[in-house]
Amino acid sequence: MNSKCHCVKLNDGHFIPVLGFGTAMPSELPKSKAKEVTKIAIDAGFHHFDSAFVYNTEDHVGEAIREKIANGTTRREDIFYTSKLWCTSLHPELVRSSLECSLKKLQLDYVDLYLIHFPMALKPGDENFPVDEHGKLLFDTVDLCATWEAMEKCKDAGLAKSIGVSNFNRRQLEKILNKPGLKYKPVCNQVECHLYLNQMKLLDFCKTNGIILVAYGVLGTQRYNGWVDQNSPVLLNEPVLSSMAKKYNQTPALIALRHQLQRGIVVLNTSLKEERIKENMKLSPEDMKVLDDLNRNLRYIAGGIFEGHPNFPFLDEY
């Protein structure tokens, strides 16, 4: 399987490719690298690109997409582009202007999917991570239902084909789903999900409510300093994964990706080495169970800088 023709239907009728390419760049690389890897990814068969305002790569990603459209490699309607609303713009009056800012950087007319990046508001302003004189993040309070109504207006205006959320727990999803006058349900919830954090209960809840789970960090995340505990285990070194890779004559990464896809999850990948997942390769139910049992509720991106925020999502069971 590659991402060319494999999609799942969202609850608003649009389709999302099951395999996406992440465009966040490690801090040690220049942001301009995003243009290069996006062009390579398009050539490799990717159609689904995941980005965000806070990644500071949207101008480069947009340039890559436009160049590939201009030379006939792809068409805009064959690209599925996701952007995300950052925490400093959760006030409803800031939502549309933030999306328009992303569109201006991209030089595109619309995004295919627009997500609330985190359910935690930060003080609005020019800084993505505003802090006080002691270096502590400046939290803000916003009604997520009001933010969601502004997201719905972006969809109605044609600026986003679909709208969803990211890093929401069950309680926060329920708040949106139970909102009086809800016009559009979130089409997805993008969360960290991998063999060590399989999100079984959250996945079941999302499926029950027609919400697709989109997984980042499927291979254990890039080990960003400041965000990821450098002492945490390396997922791809898991012995069970290694032995299963030998059994199926695949790489450990492809086994990890296939496991999530067979669970009905849309997966984001940042490695161009793993862009092709053999269509005829399927894990047996017994092996799926073995991989399910590797769960240890280990969160690589624990969001520690947000701890203490009233909307911090990772204290609930799911």
From Swiss-Prot:
- This protein is called Aldo-keto reductase family 1 member C21
Q: Which GO terms describe its cellular component?
A: cytosol
The EC designation for this entry is 1.1.1.-, 1.1.1.209
List the keywords (alphabetical): Cytoplasm, Lipid metabolism, NADP, Oxidoreductase, Steroid metabolism
Quaternary structure per UniProt?
Monomer.
The family classification in the record reads: Belongs to the aldo/keto reductase family.
Show the catalytic activity.
androsterone + NADP(+) = 5alpha-androstan-3,17-dione + NADPH + H(+); androsterone + NAD(+) = 5alpha-androstan-3,17-dione + NADH + H(+)
Q: Which residues form the active site?
A: 55 (proton donor)
Q: Could you tell me which species this protein originates from?
A: Rattus norvegicus
Designated gene of the protein: Akr1c21
Fetch the InterPro entries from UniProt: AKR, AKR1C, Aldo/ket_reductase_CS, NADP_OxRdtase_dom, NADP_OxRdtase_dom_sf
